[in-house]
Amino acid sequence: MTIADNKKAFFDYFIEERYEAGMALEGWEVKAIRANRAQIKEGYVVIRNAELFLIGAHISPLQSASTHVHPDPVRTRKLLLHAEEIKKLIGKVEQRGYTLVPLNLHYTRGRVKCEIGLAKGKKQFDKRETEKDRDWQREKARLMREKA
C-alpha cells in the first residue's frame, strides 16, 4: 500500500533502476506516517560514509505526540540496504553521473519502506517531449471515447 508518491521524480529524471530500502524511523514518525502525514516531493538521497540517507522528506508530527520528544519534521533519516546494493549504487553515482531519488513510501509486511530510484537528470527538451507525449496520449484517448 502506497503512503506517499514522488510524481515530480518521474518528470525530472529518467529512472533506470529501483531499489527498496528500509528506513530507520522514530516512534512518532511511524505514527505520523500511518496517519498519512508524510511528503517526499522535496526529498533526495545522499551517500555518506558508505551509508544512504534520506534528506528533505517531511513528516509532520502529530499533535498528540509525547511532551518529552521534540520532533524534527525534516530530519535526516538513514536508509537500510544490503552492503552489495550500497556498493553498486556508490559506484554508479560517483562515476556515471547518476543520482538517487526517493520514488515512494509504502508498507511491506507492516514495515515502512522507501523505494529509491537510480536516475539520470532530464534536460529541458526531454521534459517538453515527455509533456507532448502525455498530451497526445490524453488527446488520443479523448478521440477514441468520442468515436465509441
UniProtKB/Swiss-Prot annotation:
- Start and end residues of each stretch annotated as Disordered: 124-148
InterPro entries for this protein = SmpB, SsrA-bd_prot, SsrA-bd_prot_CS
Keyword Transferase on entry: no
Q: Name one GO molecular function term.
A: RNA binding
Enumerate the Gene Ontology biological process terms: trans-translation
Any GO CC annotation of this UniProt entry: cytosol
User: What role does this protein play?
Assistant: Required for rescue of stalled ribosomes mediated by trans-translation. Binds to transfer-messenger RNA (tmRNA), required for stable association of tmRNA with ribosomes. tmRNA and SmpB together mimic tRNA shape, replacing the anticodon stem-loop with SmpB. tmRNA is encoded by the ssrA gene; the 2 termini fold to resemble tRNA(Ala) and it encodes a 'tag peptide', a short internal open reading frame. During trans-translation Ala-aminoacylated tmRNA acts like a tRNA, entering the A-site of stalled ribosomes, displacing the stalled mRNA.
Q: What is this protein called?
A: SsrA-binding protein
What is the native source organism of this protein? Ralstonia pickettii (strain 12J)
Lineage runs:
Bacteria, Pseudomonadati, Pseudomonadota, Betaproteobacteria, Burkholderiales
Q: Which gene encodes it?
A: smpB
